[in-house]
């Protein structure tokens, strides 16, 4: 369900190793449980992380694991649209399901056991004004439904120089999200000129369907990508710098100017999320501005990578299929199929 991860990232590795990225890349990670995503690794020591999580145990672990790294900062607090304290519902069985919202009474999960904790909560704009966090280049938000409050408390930070944002969302509606969770976040993102760049989601079949399969003597569906409506959604938002320059009238508020550093960082974000076509298009469109700082022709060559979206597991499977042992045993597998037929699961139809 994760968004694209570019394991090549040749452009990013080049600008970092050649010293062409002249300032840090600041990532604000709200809901940093598990640490920052591996996609940011090509930035090396240029990556500065400011991570937030209201679970004290998580922050202590991350702080200990990154001891001695001056570019990693973790804070035990919630982030929202208020400065003060607020109730936090901690799930010790599954900490990733902890939330600023209390679990609904109709959710009958025998493994769910919430602990109410009072935690500090801060607005990102307040932290920025106090100098506790710097201007952000990218913001990632995963806070179990509290995303709207995070965005409402961060308009100045987002407009101060951020080129992109990733958030978890869904298409459901609720009293807190009458326009749908996704619709609300997309509207708030657009106010900062963030457009949808990519989307990834899983699918969860309804429980009645799963019960019917079991009643029919079939196994319930375990894969979360084969059947069902979209459930959990990850969305990448970004500033389309080409569109902002060429079609300023498309936006309801003035387009903000951007520096060459922001331009390079925007290209980096696109590449790290496997959107090399957008990255390359941006490099070509602003070649005149970039040309004084880097070799644009080389940048284009590095970004013209058709394997930027190759999933790592698919890469491994493909390598296995091309291996000598797999090719040598191919006739045996074919003979087995002729004798015994295809596996039952592969041949069974939906109507059987």
What are these regions (language model features)?
Residues 1-319, 330-351:
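Phosphate/nucleotide-binding beta-alpha loop and adjacent structural elements of enzyme active sites
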């Amino acid at each position: 369900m994760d968004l694209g991860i570019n394991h090549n990232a040749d452009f990013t590795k080049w600008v970092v190793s050649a010293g062409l990225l002249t300032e840090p890349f600041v990532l604000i990670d709200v809901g940093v449980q598990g640490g920052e995503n591996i996609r940011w690794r090509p930035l090396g020591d240029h990556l500065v992380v400011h991570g937030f999580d209201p679970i004290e145990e998580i922050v202590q672990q991350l702080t200990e694991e990154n001891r001695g790294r001056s570019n990693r900062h973790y804070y035990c607090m919630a982030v929202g649209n208020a400065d003060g304290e607020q109730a936090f519902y901690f799930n010790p069985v599954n900490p990733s399901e902890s939330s600023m919202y209390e679990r609904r009474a109709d959710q009958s999960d025998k493994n769910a056991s919430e602990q109410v904790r009072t935690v500090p909560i801060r607005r990102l704009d307040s932290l920025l004004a106090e100098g506790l966090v710097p201007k952000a280049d990218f913001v990632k938000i995963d806070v179990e439904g509290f995303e709207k409050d995070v965005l409402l408390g961060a308009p100045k930070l987002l407009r101060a120089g951020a080129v992109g944002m990733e958030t978890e969302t869904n298409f459901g509606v609720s009293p807190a999200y009458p326009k749908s969770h996704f619709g609300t976040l997309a509207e708030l993102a657009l106010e900062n000129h963030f457009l949808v760049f990519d989307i990834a989601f899983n699918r969860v079949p309804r429980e009645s369907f799963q019960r019917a399969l079991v009643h029919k003597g079939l196994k319930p569906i375990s894969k979360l990508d084969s059947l069902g409506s979209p459930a959990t959604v990850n969305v990448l938002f970004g500033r389309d710098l080409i569109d902002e320059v060429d079609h300023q009238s498309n936006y309801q508020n003035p387009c903000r100017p951007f520096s060459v550093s922001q331009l390079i960082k925007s290209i980096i974000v696109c590449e790290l999320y496997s959107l090399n076509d957008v990255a390359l298009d941006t490099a070509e469109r602003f070649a005149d501005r970039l040309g004084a700082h880097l070799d644009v022709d080389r940048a284009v060559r590095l970004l013209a990578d058709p394997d930027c979206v190759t999933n790592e597991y698919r890469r491994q499977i493909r390598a296995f299929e091309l291996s000598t042992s797999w090719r040598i045993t191919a006739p045996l597998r074919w003979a087995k199929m002729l004798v015994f037929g295809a596996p039952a699961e592969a041949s069974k139809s939906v109507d059987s």
